[in-house]
């Protein structure tokens, strides 16, 4: 019997995306964002899809690739403070189910936005730039890499 021993992760950031119902909550949140944008009176369907895609990808970039460290006091002696949330996800192991889900979800949203905007050149360029801004940092070759020293500290 282990008295006084906590049964938790060393860094809770590593497993939070694997928790029960997280993927469903994520998908419902994106759907709710789209419904809210569609309810704006002057917002057309193509604009709503493009805004959904851009807001989703901006949020994903900020929360997964720009913010570093953990909101918890972890016993890992500060190893996680220089890592983004994406680099901490699943202890840095590549090609896990969570990483695949968070890589494929902006691609699916991009396909939906492109289809519903009827491949309009302006929307297509905005959606493509938004997609690339979240897919390039997810590449395994860029794990821990800081291009031009951006987000180094």
UniProtKB/Swiss-Prot annotation:
Presence of keyword Transmembrane: yes
Location in or out of the cell: Endoplasmic reticulum membrane
GO CC annotation, single: endoplasmic reticulum membrane
Membrane-side (Extracellular) residue stretches: 43-46, 122-123
Topology Cytoplasmic: residue spans: 1-21, 68-100, 141-153
Keyword terms: Endoplasmic reticulum, Membrane, Transmembrane, Transmembrane helix
Phenotypic consequence of gene deletion: No overt phenotype; due to the redundancy with other ORMDL proteins. Simultaneous knockdown of ORMDL1 and ORMDL2 do not exhibit any visible phenotype; they remain fertile and show no sign of neurodegeneration. Double knockdown of ORMDL1 and ORMDL3 show elevated brain levels of sphingolipids, compared with single ORMDL3 knockout and wild-type animals. At 8 weeks of age, both male and female ORMDL1/3 double knockout mice weigh significantly less than wild-type mice and exhibit impaired myelination and motor-function abnormalities. The triple knockout ORMDL1, ORMDL2 and ORMDL3 is not viable.
Transmembrane segments: 22-42, 47-67, 101-121, 124-140
Membrane topology: Multi-pass membrane protein
Main location class: endoplasmic reticulum
Transmembrane as UniProt keyword: yes
Lineage: superkingdom: Eukaryota
Pfam family, one: ORMDL
Protein purpose: Plays an essential role in the homeostatic regulation of sphingolipid de novo biosynthesis by modulating the activity of the serine palmitoyltransferase (SPT) in response to ceramide levels. When complexed to SPT, the binding of ceramides to its N-terminus stabilizes a conformation that block SPT substrate entry, hence preventing SPT catalytic activity. Through this mechanism, maintains ceramide levels at sufficient concentrations for the production of complex sphingolipids, but which prevents the accumulation of ceramides to levels that trigger apoptosis.
Domain-related comment: Ceramides bind to ORMDL3 N-terminus and stabilize it in a conformation that physically restricts the accessibility of the substrates to their binding sites in the serine palmitoyltransferase (SPT) complex, hence inhibiting SPT catalytic activity. In the absence of ceramides, the N-terminus is flexible and permits substrate binding, thus liberating SPT from inhibition.
Family of the protein in this entry: Belongs to the ORM family.
Record's subunit section: Ceramide-sensitive subunit of the serine palmitoyltransferase (SPT) complex, which is also composed of SPTLC1, SPTLC2/3 and SPTSSA/B.
Protein name: ORM1-like protein 1
């Amino acid at each position: 019997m282990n008295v006084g021993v906590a049964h938790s992760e060393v860094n809770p950031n590593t497993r939070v995306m694997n928790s029960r119902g997280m993927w469903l909550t994520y998908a419902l949140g994106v759907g709710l964002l789209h419904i809210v944008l569609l309810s704006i009176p002057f917002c057309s369907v193509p604009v709503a899809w493009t805004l959904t895609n851009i807001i989703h990808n901006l949020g994903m970039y900020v929360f997964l690739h720009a913010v570093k460290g953990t909101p918890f006091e972890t016993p890992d002696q500060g190893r996680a403070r220089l890592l983004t949330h994406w680099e901490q996800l699943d202890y840095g192991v590549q090609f896990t189910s969570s990483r695949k889900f968070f890589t494929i979800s902006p691609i699916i949203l991009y396909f939906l936005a492109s289809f519903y905007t009827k491949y309009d050149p302006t929307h297509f360029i905005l959606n493509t730039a938004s997609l690339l801004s979240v897919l390039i940092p997810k590449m395994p070759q860029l794990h821990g890499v800081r291009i031009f020293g951006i987000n180094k500290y």
